[in-house]
Each structure stands twice: as structure tokens, then as C-alpha cells.
């Protein structure tokens, strides 16, 4: 346990939050990704000693890493996401819980609210077996004893992003891809919350220089 809240980047969109001994991971992708990587992941799933929860923003495999989540299932108490993601995690035998957008739940002393996201890129491509819904994707607004942390997840810019309680920390995705917040949207968010610390997310991990989603 620590007497404060510590945040560590895990590569790509993944973060570890240790808030006075309560430990969460958001979108950990620590093994088994299907593209070349630029970095060595800071920890292997088998070496994680304990997690109170894993939070997953959506189903893309650079956010919901099945190999990572299943290998940590013996040391992770619970997994949280949207209802659709809950259905996917249940098939892997994970102790998962689904929530609606706007719903709040608690993990220890941390209060967590699902924020909206718009990332239904799959609907633009043939071959998927379902029509994806906006509510299948989310972000997380996490109120810790030491401050407010916002993980937006993957999303196009939404006006609601400027109407949040002012976060102290934002996991900042400023990829200029059409299905991400984009540079213009990122600037709006930074200007809306000038006191927030911006921790860069979704960059510097996947070796795909021609793919905007993986590059700022």
C-alpha cells in the first residue's frame, strides 16, 4: 500500500493505478498482440501479484487483450466494462461485470463512472457478425482519494467530453485517426481542463508507422 495514488503506463492504452493499495489496470495489453511492437512490456501477466480490478473500454484487441486478461484471472478479483464486453469476458471464464454508460460502481475506495465513447468503426467494414452499438464502448472516470482520473477509451470527439467534472489526470489519446479524438478534439479537451496532467496514451508501442491509430 502507498499513502497516495501512483499511475504507471503499461504501453499502448494500458495503465496501472495503485491508489493507496487498491490496484487497477485499464486496458492492459501485456502479451499476445498480433502486430510487431516497439517496446518490451513493463511486466508479464504471469508476474502480476494482485489486482483488485481490470477495466476494459472496448473489444479491440489492443485494449481487450484476451491472453493478458485470462492469464491474470487467478490474481484479479473482477473485470468491468460495458454489457457487450461483459458477455465476451464471460465466455473466457472471467469474473466480469457489465455496466451502462453513466453508471457508477466502486472498487475499494475508488468510485468509477462509465463515460460515453463513439468508436463503432467495425460497422463500416463487411464481415462482422453483428452491428456494433455506441454503448458497446466506454471510458472511465475514476475518483480516487487523491484526485480524478479520466480514461476516455477510443472515441471520436464528443461534446460531452467538455462537460465532465475537471479531471486531475487524463489518459490522453491525440491520434489524428478518424475514429479517435483527433488533434483538434484533443486540443479542445486540453483547453477545457487546463489544470489536468496529460499522460500520453495509445502511442509508441505498435510498430505500424503507416497506421494513424497507433501513432500520435
Language model: regions and residue ranges:
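Bacterial Sec-exported substrate-binding components of ABC uptake systems
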Residues: 1-13
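Active-site-proximal loop/helix segment associated with metal-binding centers of metalloenzymes
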Residues: 113-146, 160
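Cap/insert and terminal regions of metallo-dependent hydrolase folds
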Residues: 80, 84-87, 156-216
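Active-site HxH/HxHxD metal-binding segment of metal-dependent hydrolases
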Residues: 42-105, 113, 118-121
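Beta-strand-turn-beta hairpins that frame and shape the catalytic cleft
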Residues: 2-5, 18-24, 104-113, 143-149
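Conserved catalytic scaffold of divalent metal-dependent phosphoesterases
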Residues: 22-32, 99-105, 109-120, 156-157, ...
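Active-site neighborhood of phospho(di)ester-bond hydrolases with catalytic His/Asp-centered motifs
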Residues: 25-27, 50-62, 79-82, 150-153, ...
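Pre-active-site segment of Zn-dependent metallo-hydrolases
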Residues: 10, 14-59, 66-71, 121-131, ...
Amino acid at each position: 500500500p502507498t499513502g497516495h495514488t501512483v499511475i504507471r503506463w503499461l504501453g499502448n492504452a494500458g495503465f496501472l493505478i495503485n491508489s493507496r493499495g487498491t490496484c487497477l489496470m485499464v486496458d492492459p495489453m501485456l502479451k499476445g498482440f498480433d502486430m510487431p511492437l516497439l517496446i518490451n512490456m513493463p511486466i508479464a501477466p504471469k508476474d502480476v501479484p494482485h489486482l483488485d480490478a481490470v477495466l476494459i473500454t472496448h473489444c479491440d484487441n489492443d485494449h481487450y487483450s484476451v491472453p493478458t486478461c485470462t492469464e491474470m484471472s487467478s490474481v484479479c478479483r473482477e473485470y468491468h466494462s460495458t454489457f457487450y464486453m461483459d458477455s465476451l469476458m464471460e465466455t473466457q471464464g472471467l469474473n466480469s461485470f457489465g455496466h451502462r454508460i453513466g453508471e457508477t460502481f466502486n472498487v475499494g475506495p475508488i468510485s468509477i463512472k462509465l463515460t460515453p465513447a463513439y468508436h463503432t468503426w467495425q460497422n463500416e467494414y463487411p464481415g462482422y457478425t453483428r452491428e456494433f452499438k455506441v454503448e458497446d464502448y466506454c471510458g472511465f472516470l475514476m475518483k480516487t482519494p487523491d484526485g480524478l482520473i479520466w480514461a476516455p477509451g477510443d472515441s471520436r470527439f464528443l461534446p460531452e467530453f467538455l462537460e465532465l467534472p475537471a479531471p486531475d489526470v487524463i489518459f490522453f489519446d491525440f491520434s489524428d485517426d478518424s475514429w479517435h479524438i483527433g488533434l483538434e478534439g484533443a486540443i479542445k479537451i486540453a483547453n477545457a481542463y487546463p489544470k489536468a496532467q496529460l499522460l500520453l496514451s495509445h502511442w509508441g508501442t505498435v510498430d505500424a508507422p503507416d497506421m494513424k491509430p497507433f501513432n500520435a
